[in-house]
Amino acid sequence: IVLVHGVGLNHKIWEPQIDAFDNSVLAYDILGHGKTPLNKDNISFDNFSNQLINLIDELKMKKIHLIGFSIGSLIARNFASKFNDRLESLTLLCSIFNRTKKQQQIVKDRFELAKKSKSLSKQALKRWFTDDYLEKNPNTYNKISSILEQNNMENFLKVYELFVNHKDNEKFENIKTKTLVMTGEGDIGSTPEMSENLSKVINNSKVKIIPKGK
């Protein structure tokens, strides 16, 4: 199992999942996050796919179960469209697709705010988790807040801009592995409707919507 985190985060967000799985699990820092440098000004999702294929080749992993969250799901989509033969399965968590002009503008406004403030708003946690969950899991709030605060803002903005401008231009017809598309019932950024529509363009896929989830 290979886990790909979201923008502004790092591999440590997957610690509960690593503890839960009996399988061998790999969680890594994507380019420009955690301890992984980003040495390019012009980046694309191909760079992230190349990072992943080089990593699993180095570790001699022939086939993997790939799970991506948020921008990690876009990396996973790109990877699957290019290296489908290396996948046993694909899971796309909270994956944007076919955003409306209004949805696109909200993300652009958030990006502009991040550029001006030079910091990551903890409001992101309000988007990612319900109030009830954060109240019951204060350690999660503190842990992810700490990760957000440690970001290299220059690198973060480069990667975030890639997410903001994404146009769903993957070759979905190349994705033939069994795929699960998941999001939360209350996710306003990657909505249930997006997941339903994404599943329609990926053969051999199904959708799971988490009740009361964000």
Where are these regions (language model features)?
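Flexible "cap/lid" loop of the alpha/beta hydrolase fold
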Residues: 77-82, 87-118, 128
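Gly/Ala-rich beta-loop-alpha elbow adjacent to hydrolase catalytic centers
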Residues: 68-72, 76
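Conserved alpha/beta-hydrolase catalytic His-Asp/Glu region
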Residues: 101-105, 118-173
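Catalytic histidine neighborhood in serine/cysteine hydrolases
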Residues: 192-214
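Short beta-strand/loop motif that positions the catalytic acidic residue
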Residues: 175, 181-183, 187
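Conserved acidic catalytic loop of the alpha/beta-hydrolase fold
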Residues: 46-64
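Conserved HGGG/HGGXW glycine-rich cap/lid loop of the alpha/beta-hydrolase fold
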Residues: 1-41, 55
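Residue in the alpha/beta-hydrolase core beta-strand immediately N-terminal to the catalytic nucleophile
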Residues: 29, 65, 88-91, 173
